[in-house]
C-alpha cells in the first residue's frame, strides 16, 4: 500500500509514490506468466525467460513489431550474476585442480552465449563476480575467452594427473539447460568432457547446500546495493548449509580483507 507520509518528491515537486498500491503475483510457469502479461493481466515483468524470448525479441535484442506499441522495454544493468560453482571439498580430481577450473573459465565465449541464447540481453561476466552497475565492479578482473589457453591447461592437467579423459558433471535445471549445453560443447573442444545432470530447482538447491554436486549452475541476486552482498558468499564462516558459501571456498587473505571492509 502507498505510504502517504513518504518523504521524497519527483523533479516537479509531486509527492511519491504515484501508485496507490501494487499487487505482486508469483507464477511458477514462465510461459503462463508471459501469456498473462500479453493479455494485460500483468503490467510488469522483471526478467526475460528462454521460453518466450524469441516471441518477444528479435535476434539482436529489439522488441518485435508486434509488441512495439504495447510494451515499453527498459534495459539496464541488473544486479544478478549467473555463475558456475565448484564444490571445493569434492574428492573429484578435476574439481580439485586449479588447472581445470581455469580451463573452464577460459574455455567458453560468454559474449556469444549472450547473443545467441539471450538475444543480446545481458552482459558477459568478464569483470569478476560483482556485476556491472554496482560499486566494486572491475572490468579488468575475471576471465576472457581464450580457447587455446583452455586447451593448454587441460593438456597440462592430463600430464600431471595421468587422467587421459578428464570429465566433470555439471548440474542444472531445465530452464538453463541451453546455457549448459553451450558450455558443454565449447569445453569439449578443449578436451574436457562435461556430463549434464538436470534436476528440479528445489532438488538442486538442497543438493547444492549439502555438498552433493561437484559443479552447478546458479545465480546470485543482490539483496541490497553493496558489493558485500556478493563477497559474503565467499566468506569461510558462511559455509553451506548454514550459509551461502556453497563452494566451501576458504582463503585466509580474503577473510581478513572481508572483515576489514566493515
Residue ranges and their predicted role:
Residues 24-35, 50-51, 174-175, 197-206:
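Short helix-initiation/N-cap motifs at beta->coil->alpha
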Residues 55-74, 210-212, 226-243:
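Ligand-binding "clamshell"
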Amino acid at each position: 500500500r502507498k505510504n502517504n507520509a513518504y518523504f521524497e518528491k519527483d523533479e516537479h515537486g509531486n509527492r511519491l509514490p504515484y501508485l496507490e498500491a501494487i499487487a505482486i503475483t508469483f507464477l511458477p510457469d514462465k510461459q503462463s506468466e508471459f501469456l498473462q502479461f500479453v493479455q494485460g493481466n500483468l503490467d510488469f515483468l522483471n526478467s526475460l525467460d528462454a521460453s518466450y524470448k524469441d516471441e518477444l525479441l528479435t535476434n539482436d535484442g529489439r522488441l518485435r513489431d508486434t509488441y512495439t506499441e504495447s510494451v515499453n522495454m527498459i534495459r539496464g544493468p541488473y544486479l544478478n550474476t549467473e555463475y558456475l560453482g565448484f564444490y571445493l571439498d569434492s574428492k573429484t580430481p578435476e574439481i580439485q585442480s586449479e588447472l581445470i577450473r581455469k580451463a573452464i573459465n577460459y574455455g567458453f565465449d560468454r559474449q556469444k552465449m549472450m547473443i545467441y541464447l539471450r538475444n543480446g540481453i545481458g552482459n558477459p561476466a568478464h569483470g569478476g563476480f560483482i556485476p556491472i552497475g554496482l560499486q566494486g565492479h572491475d572490468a579488468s578482473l575475471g576471465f576472457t575467452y581464450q580457447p587455446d589457453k583452455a586447451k593448454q591447461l587441460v593438456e597440462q592437467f592430463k600430464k600431471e594427473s595421468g587422467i587421459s579423459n578428464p570429465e566433470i558433471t555439471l548440474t542444472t535445471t531445465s530452464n538453463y539447460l541451453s546455457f549448459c549445453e553451450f558450455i558443454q560443447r565449447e569445453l569439449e573442444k578443449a578436451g574436457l568432457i562435461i556430463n549434464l545432470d538436470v534436476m528440479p530447482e528445489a532438488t538442486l538447491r538442497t543438493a547444492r547446500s549439502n555438498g552433493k554436486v561437484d559443479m552447478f549452475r546458479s545465480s546470485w541476486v543482490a539483496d541490497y546495493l553493496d558489493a558485500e552482498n556478493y563477497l559474503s558468499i565467499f566468506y569461510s564462516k558462511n559455509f553451506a548449509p548454514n550459509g551461502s558459501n556453497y563452494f566451501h571456498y576458504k582463503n585466509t587473505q580474503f577473510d581478513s580483507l572481508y572483515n576489514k571492509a566493515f
